[in-house]
Amino acid sequence: MTINLTKFSLTILVALTLTACGSSGGSGDSQSAHTPSTSIHTQNNSTPNKNTSTPPVNVSNANNLEIKNNDKTGGAFIISGEDGHVTLKKVDITTNSDLNVLYIDGTKIPLSSPSIKSNGWLNIRSGTGKVSIDGIETSRDLKVCCGKYTDTRIGKVLSKNKNEDTYFFYNGNLTRNMPVGGTVNYNTGDSILSSYHDELGDTDEAVGTSQFSADFVNKKLTGSLSVNEKKLNINADISGNTFSGTTQSDAFKSQGIAEGKFYGENAKELGGLVKANDNSWSGAFAAKK
């Protein structure tokens, strides 16, 4: 569904209806007092769970963590340059006071609004001007996931001029009570990848799925991202409510690294970033039990 606006700094009031990816889609009513320039639509790229059973987890002896005000709640890649000459700078996100607002490198970016309901990906295009969401303006295009996650946000903020940066990001409400035993499967997940060497086929960006398994006894996280029939495997070590590791895939020329965090009660969700060692691709992912 699409909502159109023309004037700069307009407040978005929407009633959105999800469109299932790969199906004939659906339609809904929208409220707009203006003519086209800014568009918003949602899509659902999730696939049904293949296995929703989760082995029991020992949470009675959960490891309670102290969360401080200056703790790193997420992270972002600041992307600059053009295809073949891309540079990525990693920055930490240190606030999750509002998951609908992103604070990166001194910039405040609106991601969504309580009035916008989307279980899948939310796409906001600002056209040639600016869009205002809950009083916060941005001239960037946004791709944000997803309303299905109560404690996690991931996505991409796309610059349209040389004076602004493009970001991949993840952020959320850090887990305070980490499980200390058992294995948890995260079978419902989403991902977004950009490739600068045509490794995703006819597109340089695509959304897909993700799934993970966390072994809280041996402190290991394994999983994969699936985008455009390309699979990227992740192997990481768990430390507290964070994880870091490597990626491997026969579909990409360069292998890479992964990082992320657990979010919500008893680590019910996770989110993170991936990137190639040579910066030829990068992306973000999230998953939940």
Swiss-Prot record:
Record's compositionally biased regions (Polar residues): 33-43
Annotated spans, Disordered: 25-66
Compositional bias of kind Low complexity: 44-59
Ranges in coiled-coil conformation: none
InterPro entries with a match to the protein in the record: OMP/PagP_b-brl, Slam_hemophilin_C, TbpB_B_D
Protein name stated in the entry: Uncharacterized protein HI_0973
Species this protein is from: Haemophilus influenzae (strain ATCC 51907 / DSM 11121 / KW20 / Rd)
